[in-house]
Amino acid sequence: AEGSFDVQIQILEAGAASGIPVSGTAGAAGISGGDTTYVMPPERAVAALTRDILNRIPRRISDKDGHPGDMVNFVIVGSEERLKRAFENGGWVLVDRTKADAVVHTLISTLSKEEYVEMPMSELYLFGRPQDFGFAHADPYAVVATRHHLRVWKSASEVGGETLWVGAATHDVGFEKDQRNGSVTHKIDPDIDLEREYLARTLVASGVVTQWAHVTPENALTGAKTATGGSFHSDGRILVLVVGEGSSSGATSK
C-alpha cells in the first residue's frame, strides 16, 4: 500500500501537560491502579522528520498475499537498543518469533507456574518482509482472547542520523471469522486510536522517550477493513516517538 503525507505537527503550549487516565499496570513505567493518572509531558515537534521521509512510509501493512491490513499508526526514531529498552520499561514483552519457540517457552512457563504472555503473532508485511519485532502488553489470564500488541519494521530511512522504525498497533478484543478462509482469527478493537494512545502513554512513561507528537497526513485514513475482513476507524493521526538514553527507572505517576 502506498500513501502521501502532508504533515501537521500538533504541539501543546510550552509548559502544558495533559492528564491521561490510566487503568491496569504498565510494569516499570510506574503506572498502576485503576484511578491513577499519569501526567504526560507536552508534545514537541520532531523537526528532522521531514515530509519527504513520511512520504516514503506506506500507509498500511499487508498479509503475505498483499491484501491490505492494519493501518500504520506510529513511528519511532532511535537505535534498536533504545527501542527495546523503551518497550521493556513500558511493560511490553518481545513475543516469540516461531511456533518452536512457543512450545519451549510454554513448557518452561508451565513447569515454573508462570503465565505465558509472549505467544507468537501472525506475520504481516511491510517493505516486502514480515515484522522485525512484535511486542505484547496483556493481562496474562486473558492473553488468549485479548492482548495489546504491535509489529515494528526497520525502515531504510534515518531521521537526524537515527533509525526510523515504522509500526502498527492494535488491540485484540476477542475472536471473529476470517473472511479469507472461514477460520477463526482475533478481532481487533475497531477504534484503533485507543491503542495508539495506549502505546503513547506506556512508552512516554518509560523514561526513554525524549520527544513525542502526532502527525496528521493529507487525506488521512479514517476507516478501512483489515486483511481478515474486520473493520476499523481512526482520526488518521500517526504517533511519533523519539527514544534517547533516558532513564532506566521510568517515569512516575501523580
Walk through the language-model features, giving the residues of each.
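Structured segments of extracytoplasmic/periplasmic soluble domains
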Residues: Q10-A14, A86-V93, V152-S155, T202, ...
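Primarily extracytoplasmic ectodomains and periplasmic/lumenal surface modules that are beta-strand-rich
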Residues: S79-V95, D101-A102
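Envelope-exposed proteins and targeting segments
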Residues: G3-V7, D70-V72, G90, H148
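Charged, low-complexity intrinsically disordered tails and linkers
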Residues: G3-P58
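A cross-kingdom signal targeting lumenal/periplasmic-facing segments of multi-pass membrane
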Residues: T98-S253
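Accessory recognition modules or surfaces
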Residues: T50-G66, H105-V117
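Solvent-exposed loop and beta-edge segments used for protein-protein assembly and interaction
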Residues: E2-G3, G66-P68, F127-R129, V144
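Terminal, regulation- and interaction-focused segments at domain boundaries
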Residues: R56-A86
